[in-house]
A protein has these predicted regions:
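Short, Lys/Arg-enriched N-terminal segments with co-localized hydrophobic residues
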Residues: 1-3
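Sec-dependent signal peptide recognition
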Residues: 5-12
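Formylglycine-dependent sulfatase
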Residues: 20-447, 451-491
Length: 495
């Protein structure tokens, strides 16, 4: 280039000195991992969504790699996050379902079943690698009196909801910063109530379901501050956003972005969560507002000169929900995949994964590498240049990120206890096995689908491939017994 600028010359010099290895010992990359809550496979523009606007995530995909066969750890919140943080699938992980230590409701904020004290998490691993670790958002793996809290599980810093139940309300009275309560400018109201006004079409009668401090906004501001404060050394920032989990609540400015977009009927809070006079616009507005904040985070990385040396990832903890006024059919939220949140069919567990790392991940690429949440721990270890624990279920997807295909035929396993009277699923290569009603019958029949030929799981071909079914049954039967009896099937534990 005839007019090469001094910064460009310097950058080239640094590139030559640094060599072409993905990771240098002197300057390990920052890692920002963003996790949506109940966002379906088809709810981003880059995954085919046409009604909900996600320009910043679409830009992230255009600048990086989009995965088409990535799986969450579970079809519901807590166990999915547990697999992400520990590198263990629900074949043998501690947390295999949502479990409310404090019951419903939970005024003491005892939260969900906690991770054991001393669990080796992604946070612990990256702390050991010299990273400052932060988590901002929804935790769900230990309440305020437990050793499962982030500050005891490898995170130097936490701000957000410890208890998933409180995260049902986007206008909470308070959040938690490490071990301290942080009050917000919101009056208390339950996140589960029916419409009690006189006119369900009157927007004013829904104001009671709003407050002043929208938790997403407060947490996004905190994320910008964390990045700024830790700009001079390697950091890992885990951002488990609460969007678009119900209740349907969003500030008026985001609702207004969808004025006139949809013909919609009010949702009156039946059967659960909160009423909303414009439920389609509220849902779309929530996702777009999250996308706005992601844009702010990406811009902040640019402004601080950190974007080049920061791996940014975005995923979702499970598929779209089936309740609270959400219309997954209207938005084609799963892009045709069968099932929703709580299901082990593809719509419940196949999720978006977008990854950007300038200079390493080729822009505008796509990978059909089969991967899952428990692969993140060894992937982050590779990125940070450290060893992952040997005894985990994950495999690093760094080769896929760098454009090398792996796609081995390892098996991926899920189990879920909250619906279907107990369910298990296994993916091996092109094959997917699903077994329902396992609490009742540990030898329940296994459905078999060929995901290459039948991605929407419409045709059970178990009778045609008995050998594959037996291979899948062996994986299902190899699950370890959980210490929590309700999370066992009669065949492998005390159910």
């Amino acid at each position: 280039e005839p007019h090469m600028t001094m910064p460009r010359i310097l950058a080239l010099g640094i590139l030559v000195i640094g060599g072409c290895t993905p990771v240098t010992d002197t300057n390990p990359p920052n890692i920002v991992y963003m996790l949506a809550d109940d966002l379906g496979y088809g709810e981003l523009g880059s995954y085919g969504q046409s009604l909900i606007r996600t320009p910043n995530l679409d830009r992230l995909a255009a600048d990086g790699m989009r995965f088409t066969q990535h799986y969450s750890g579970s079809p519901v919140c807590a166990p999915s996050r547990g697999t992400l943080l520990t590198g263990l699938s629900t074949l043998r992980s501690q947390i295999r379902d949502n479990y409310e230590v404090g019951g419903y409701p939970d005024p003491e904020e005892l939260g969900q079943m906690p991770l054991d004290s001393g669990t080796y998490t992604i946070g612990t691993m990256l702390q050991d690698a010299g990273y400052v670790t932060g988590a901002i958002g929804k935790w769900g793996l230990g309440g305020r009196e437990s050793l499962g809290q982030p500050r005891f599980q490898g995170f130097d810093y936490f701000f957000g909801y410890l208890d998933q139940q409180l995260a049902h309300n986007f206008y909470p009275t308070h959040l938690w910063r490490n071990g301290s309560r942080v009050d917000l400018d919101n009056e208390y109201f339950s996140a589960h109530q029916r419409f009690e006004g006189t006119d369900p079409t009157d927007p004013e009668q829904y104001k009671r379901y709003q407050g002043n401090d929208y938790s997403l906004d407060v947490m996004a501001d905190d994320a910008l501050r964390f990045i700024e404060e830790n700009r001079d050394h390697p950091f890992f920032l885990y951002l488990p956003f609460t969007i678009p989990h119900v209740a349907l609540q969003v500030p008026d400015s985001s609702l207004a972005q969808y004025d006139g977009a949809f013909e919609e009927e009010p949702y009156l809070g039946d059967p659960t969560y909160l009423p909303h006079h414009r439920p389609l616009s509220a849902y779309a507005g929530m996702i777009t507002r999250m996308d706005d904040h992601i844009g702010r985070i990406l811009d902040h990385l640019d402004e601080l000169g950190l974007a080049e040396n920061t791996v940014v990832m975005f995923a979702s903890d499970n598929g779209t929900t089936y309740t609270g006024g959400v219309d997954a059919e209207f938005f084609e939220s799963t892009a045709g995949l069968r099932g929703l949140k709580g299901s082990l069919y593809e719509g419940g567990i196949r999720v978006p994964l977008i990854a950007r790392w300038p200079g390493h991940i080729e822009a505008g690429t796509e990978s059909d590498e089969v991967s899952a949440f428990w692969d993140m721990m060894p992937t982050f270890a590779d990125i940070a240049g450290v060893e992952a624990p040997a005894d985990i279920d994950g495999t690093s997807i760094l080769p896929a990120l760098l454009g090398e295909q792996r796609n081995d035929d390892r098996s991926l396993y899920w189990e879920y206890h909250g619906l279907w009277n107990g369910a298990q699923a296994v993916r091996v290569g092109q094959w997917k096995g699903v077994r329902l009603g396992v609490h009742e019958d540990p030898h329940a029949p296994i459905e078999l689908y060929d995901l290459e030929a039948d991605p929407f799981e419409t045709s059970d071909i178990a009778d045609r491939y008995p050998g594959v079914v037996e291979q899948i049954r062996a994986v299902m039967d190899s699950r370890t017994e959980s210490d929590h009896k309700p999370w066992n099937f009669a065949s492998t534990g005390e159910g």
